[in-house]
Structure formats: structure tokens, C-alpha cells
């Protein structure tokens, strides 16, 4: 079957925003307008169509949220049919992982801001993540009908607070109750929306006389920004003082794809004024899969090689081309009560038909692809194949987790994995009844498969099941989902902080010796190891894991025992050296030792290395680290003193303060151990008017009274 939409007419986009910018309404409107332009005849005969709104009401948790395929011909039918895959992203910081994983598979993003609140603390987090993945963006300033809305003020905030260059391609006509439409700066026309068809169509008129000067000023800014795309456009602009509509769009597009500028549009999704033009901006300014850099990957044989040791020759590339070997990234796993496990994948190269086999190159397991579906604005469609650039859900994959690569059996590759943060908070969960016991195991397994920032383990000493995640809200929602989706009732223990340890000295030389020789075959392992504290970057982040080097010369320790020494250090790192918490990072160099022809073996050297590592508590200056959270509280000014006093009592360090529409924004770094129950406390302090967000910042040394309590607890 041939491709129905040319790949240069694909757009894989995400709608990103913080909690109250009106993202859900905007996404719903996109589905509404694209659903209208999607001709039913294009759906393959016999496709199972179900109204997605009914499904959402049944579920509560949507499967449409992962990825929806829509079609768009332009607000005036000015384009060939474009295929727009919309990936939804949550706005809450406990779910930063969700945003990260969707940005990883997007080619472009629409970032929604509220016309009144503008740039809020959480919008900065989303923006930073989009920078990390180099995602080209279009800005949509929504809620222009709200009191205090001001498009150009928000544009100024994006420039000053986010450090990016926004280029308005529209201006708002009126604001608040009098918001009527937009000035299209590219065509220099005023746009007014028709209420009788819910803003599907609009009429173009001349720009109101009182706005002409402002429109001319912003248009010349925009044309100048477009002209800076290349020399040819710049020369024409300098000679003629203007560019054609096509040239303006081409110039802005080139600079948007290079992440030099972000085109900005405005509107009111709720009042049906402007969303079709947001979709036009997606087509005009955001990239097709062929316009983003080829995705890189490594061969499965190199999976154990540390990332910083990989050289250019180790990498392979996959281009957005049907003729290349198949490769895809699983970016979300969802459990659907009707069809079982849905694995959402982004196809980067090649094509795949249902019934084909692929290999999960991360786990080395072969999987047969049964059914495949795509979500549309108003139906779920069973499809027979996927091609480069597509986003679809595979049904019935057995052993795939988020971030795994699926690829061609003969041309294997592991695409760059997503970085998943380590959980910072843990709680014990216990099933309420015997019947819940087994169900809980299955439920937790499924939830962990869906969400890589959620971990499940059994405490060896107490036998309790411990779940870990990114914050209290994260774990609350997972426990709630266990109850709602899997019918499992569980009791939750008190939250526990994930402490870590490290050493504070460098170049500490320690001897590890394990000798058992009492007749017959004995044990003999002897090594000298030089330990140093891990490196720390400019932002205070510690290099995690073991950096191990071998400087043994002359064969005093045979080569085959070196991996055992490394393993011994790693195993002891998991158990810690001060209070039983894992060592976050460590540098170790084995440089000397001795062996016995008969009695030496791998086990003996492993034990010797482990014994040497244990001595770091005294000799290496072992310290306990606690997770420090970046906290932002938005509070009315009247409660500012109380909020700041409370943060100080929680050992918080105030980093700074800003003004926002809703009051003062207090930025602080606070140890996680002091933040339990903060949601309730901050509400009661401010009579329910303050709100806060919190994300992991770094690990830092814990004060001695806390360390003493932890050591005592370990007994």
C-alpha cells in the first residue's frame, strides 16, 4: 500500500503549556476543526469508528491523550491535505517525565500561554525541556477575552524571562470583553470570526484605522526578522523595503526551524476565535519529519559502553525515509480495558506491516506486531502499516517499556534513549485484603511499565512493597489509578526520602584483602584501590555511578580478575558505607595487588574489593546526601511573610522573588524531607489562595543531626 500523505506534509507536534493556560480547550478545538475538515471517505472501509468523547467519559483517563492523528487543509482550504499528529503533554511538574517523553518524539511544539498570567513558573520548565531537545516552537497566547489580557505584554515576558526572540505574526484587535479578532501582519488584513459556525470561518477586512500605525511598526519588525534568514532575502529587503507573503513565510520558517525565533499568534480558544490560524502557523512554520536532523543510535553490542566513551564512529543514523531499515521508539505504554496493552511508537525510518516481526534491540527480544491503530479526532482506526514519520499504537507487545527501540531484525540499532530522572520519594503500600495481594502485584507491574519514573521494589528486611516516584502527587495519582482501573485497595505508609551517600575525600588508597587458606582449596584476593569523590558540574549535579579504571601493570593482578574487582565495588556501592543508602557516584582505580596461583578466583577478588570499599566510611569521609527540591510558591502579597518564614523553618534557602499577576512568586531550594504535607500547610497559611510547584534540583550534604538519626535507624 502506497503512502497516502507525502512525508513533507506531515507535522508531528505537541501542545505544551502549564496548568491553566487553556491547553485542553485548545486541543479540543483543534480536534473539532480538523475533524470537520477530515473527509470521512478517507477512512479505510470497515475501520472501527468510536466517538472519542464517549470513550473519554467511560475511561476518565484518556487514551486519546497520547497521540491523535488529524488532517488539515488550511483555514481557507489553501493547502493540500496535511497530516498533523498531535501529542498531548501534561502541565503539572510531577509529570515532567511525561512532557520529556513527548518532546523527545515531537518535531515541533505549540506552546500555549495565558493572555493574563503570561509566563508562569511552570512554563519555564516546559520551555527549558523544549530547549534541551531543540524543538522548534510557535507561541499561542490564549484567553485574550479574559480581564487583564495583553498579547504584547506576554510577548515581552517571553523575550525577557525565557530569553527567546518571539516574532508576532498577528496583533489582537481589542482585548478582554472587546476582543474581536486578529490583525494578520503577513497579509495586512483584519480577521473577524463567524460565531454561527463556531469560528470555523472568518472574514477579512481592512485594518481598523486606529491600529494601522501599530500594525505597520510590528510588520516591519516581522519582515526584518524574516529577511535575516539568508543573504538573498536580506538584499531584497534592503533594496525594496519589503518582501512577498511567500518570502516572509519562508524566512520565518527557516529561522523557526533553526530555533532562532518563535512566531507568536493570539486568540481565544474558548470563544472560538483563532485556533484555525494556530493550525495554519503549524503548517507554515513547524518542520516536517524530513526537516529535522536524522536520529542517531548505536549498535546493540555497544549498550554497555558508557555514554561519554562513545565516539563518532559508534553512532549510526536513521533518516525519515521509507526505504531505510525500520526503526521506531516506544514513547508511551497505555493499558486499555478493551484491547490490552497499547504501545505508542514514533516511526523514524522504514515501514512496518501488521504481522511483521521486529526486534526490541534494548532487550534483545523478538516481537511480532499484531494489530496497529491510529487515534483520529472522532474515531479509532485499525491500520495495516506504518511508515517513517507516523505515530501509532501497536497492540499486544509483550515486553516493551517506555524508551525501548523497535527495529529491523537484520539492521539493528538502539535509538538515543530518554533520560529518566531517579525517583526522590518512596512510600510503603500494603494490600487491604488477601484478595488484593495478587492483584496489586499485577497492577503495580503494569503501572511501572507505563511510567519509567515510577519504581516498585520489595524491602528485603521488612518484606514490604515500596513504590517510588517524582513527588507526593505522582504517587497519589498512581495509588488512585490502582483503585480505579485495577480495583485494588491499598494502605499507604508515610513517605520516605531517597537519601544517597558519597565520599568527600580524593586519592584515598585502601587495601582490600580476603584470604581463607586452611588446607585444601582456599580463597585469595588482594587489591589496592585508589578512591576519589565523584565529579560535580557547574550546576551542582554529581556524576552518578562508578567511574572505574585499571592501572595494574606487570600482571600483579591477572586481567581476568579486574571485572570482579569492579563488581565488588559496585555491589558495595548499592549498600552504602555510612547509613546503608546507595553511593551516588564514585571514582575508583585499581593499581596494585597480588594473587595466588591456586587459591585466587573471581569471588575472592570481588569480596576483597567490597571490603576495601566498606572502609570508605572512615577513610573516605563518607557523607549522607539529601534530595533538594526547587520550590516556587505563588502567593498573594498579604501572606508573603508567613510563606517565607515557613520556608525558612523548613531549612529552605530563598533564591529570589518575582512579581506575577496572581501575586508574588517566591523561589527557594528546600530539602524534600521537610516538604511532606506542604500542599495542606501552604493552603491553610494563605486561606487557599497560594499555590506551589516543586521539582527535583540536586543532592546536597545532609546536616549532622539528620545523619545521626538515619544511622541510628539503620541500627
UniProtKB/Swiss-Prot annotation:
GO cellular component annotations, sorted alphabetically? cytoplasm
Q: Does the keyword Transcription apply?
A: no
Keywords annotated in UniProt: Cytoplasm, Elongation factor, GTP-binding, Nucleotide-binding, Protein biosynthesis
* Superkingdom as given in the UniProt entry: Bacteria
Q: Which residues are listed for GTP binding in this entry? A: 17-24, 88-92, 142-145
Ranges for domain tr-type G come to 8-290
Check the record and name the InterPro entries matching this protein. Answer: EFG_II, EFG_III, EFG_III/V, EFG_IV, EFG_V, EFG_V-like, EFTu-like_2, G_TR_CS
Q: Which GO terms describe its biological process?
A: ribosome disassembly
Q: Does the keyword Protein biosynthesis apply?
A: yes
Task: Quote the subcellular location field of this record.
Answer: Cytoplasm
Write out the similarity annotation.
Belongs to the TRAFAC class translation factor GTPase superfamily. Classic translation factor GTPase family. EF-G/EF-2 subfamily.
Q: What does this protein do?
A: Catalyzes the GTP-dependent ribosomal translocation step during translation elongation. During this step, the ribosome changes from the pre-translocational (PRE) to the post-translocational (POST) state as the newly formed A-site-bound peptidyl-tRNA and P-site-bound deacylated tRNA move to the P and E sites, respectively. Catalyzes the coordinated movement of the two tRNA molecules, the mRNA and conformational changes in the ribosome.
Q: Which PANTHER family match?
A: RIBOSOME-RELEASING FACTOR 2, MITOCHONDRIAL, TRANSLATION ELONGATION FACTOR G-RELATED
Protein name, per record: Elongation factor G
Which gene underlies this protein? fusA
